[in-house]
Swiss-Prot record:
Residues 115-150 form the EF-hand domain. This is EF-hand calcium-binding domain-containing protein 1. GO terms for cellular component: extracellular region. The keyword Metal-binding applies. Gene3D superfamilies: EF-hand.
């Protein structure tokens, strides 16, 4: 089909002379760009809707694995038994009893998969890094699941776990180490007492109110 169209276009270009030939080439280029745009739309729709459920084997499955988004290493681990299904990135959608973890039964029920299916079991075992039979948020978001990037409140949690930003992260702000985690200071003391986080200055001495130095500087400037 494509070869026939190319031959037809070549014949038309040869028959048309001068400016008409230039206009025809420009028209053909526009048509080509339009076809590519339509192809991208079809690809996006097929990958999000058709591939996860319909492309299980044969040519269709091959096209999905090559054209749709997914993790190549995970696809290889699954031994090419099925396409990785894009699912919503909302952890709460799968944590049905709101206990902070996702069980195998909860996940299977949420995505409509057979809990005993080999592909489902393999993907779940890959995600369950600590082997306790349950998925924490970090295990879930770093697992072999392809997530739909819908804009919602859970995108922050998704990005946080994908970037491996954990609760004990220490940021460097203007040469000072800022502790962001309550557990950094004597276990849960800060969380239990409600005291503010400490700032570790360059001198190694903690400052409970780092803003004070800026207030004092402003007052000193006013008096001068």
């Amino acid at each position: 089909m494509k070869v026939s169209l190319l031959l037809l276009a070549l014949v038309l270009v040869c028959l048309v002379q001068g400016s008409e030939s230039w206009r025809l080439r420009r028209t053909l280029r526009r048509i080509g760009r339009g076809i590519r745009r339509v192809g991208r739309v079809v690809k996006n729709v097929a990958c999000n809707h058709a591939c996860p459920r319909l492309c299980r084997q044969g040519v269709c499955k091959l096209a999905c694995n090559l054209g749709c988004r997914g993790k190549r290493d995970v696809t290889q681990q699954l031994n090419q038994q099925g396409h990785v299904t894009p699912i919503p990135n909302s952890f709460a959608a799968y944590d049905m009893n709101e206990d902070g973890i996702i069980s195998r039964k909860e996940l299977a029920l949420a995505i409509g998969e057979d809990i005993a299916h080999p592909d489902f079991m393999k993907a779940y075992s890959i995600a369950d890094v600590d082997g306790d039979g349950e998925l924490s948020p970090k295990e879930f978001y770093n697992g072999p699941y392809v997530f739909e990037m819908d804009l919602n409140d859970d995108d922050l949690a998704y990005c946080r776990y994908r970037l491996d930003i954990d609760d004990d992260l220490i940021d460097v702000i203007e040469g000072e180490l800022v502790n962001q985690a309550p557990n950094f200071i004597e276990g849960n003391q800060v969380k239990e007492t409600g005291k503010p986080h400490e700032i570790i200055s360059k001198t190694g001495q903690p400052e409970t109110k780092p803003i004070d130095k800026y207030v004092k500087l402003a007052e000193k400037t006013k008096t001068q």
